[in-house]
Amino acid sequence: MTALAAGIAMLAGLGVGIGIGIATAKAAESVGRQPEAYGRILPLFFIGAALAEAVAIYSFVIAILLVLKV
């Protein structure tokens, strides 16, 4: 049962992967349209990607804790 719970916890990684993929596509599209805005787009993208990736890291930690029964 705990393995199922850990698997469900890791479903957050699916959403994060899709979200970061969409954000990357939009950032690349924005830079393609306005190359002079590269300096403003890239830092915002990295901040957004880091915040989204934090969700995946938290779900991974929760899954590990569930499997190890800590």
Swiss-Prot record:
Any one Pfam family here would be ATP-synt_C
Q: Where in the cell is it found?
A: Cell membrane
Question: In which broad location class does this protein mainly occur, judging by the first location in its UniProt entry?
Answer: membrane
Reversibly protonated during proton transport (site feature) positions: 53
- Locate the transmembrane regions by residue number: 3-23, 44-64
Q: Which UniProt keywords apply?
A: ATP synthesis, Cell membrane, CF(0), Hydrogen ion transport, Ion transport, Lipid-binding, Membrane, Transmembrane, Transmembrane helix, Transport
The record's subunit annotation is: F-type ATPases have 2 components, F(1) - the catalytic core - and F(0) - the membrane proton channel. F(1) has five subunits: alpha(3), beta(3), gamma(1), delta(1), epsilon(1). F(0) has three main subunits: a(1), b(2) and c(10-14). The alpha and beta chains form an alternating ring which encloses part of the gamma chain. F(1) is attached to F(0) by a central stalk formed by the gamma and epsilon chains, while a peripheral stalk is formed by the delta and b chains.
Recorded protein name is ATP synthase subunit c
User: Which species does this protein come from?
Assistant: Caldicellulosiruptor saccharolyticus (strain ATCC 43494 / DSM 8903 / Tp8T 6331)
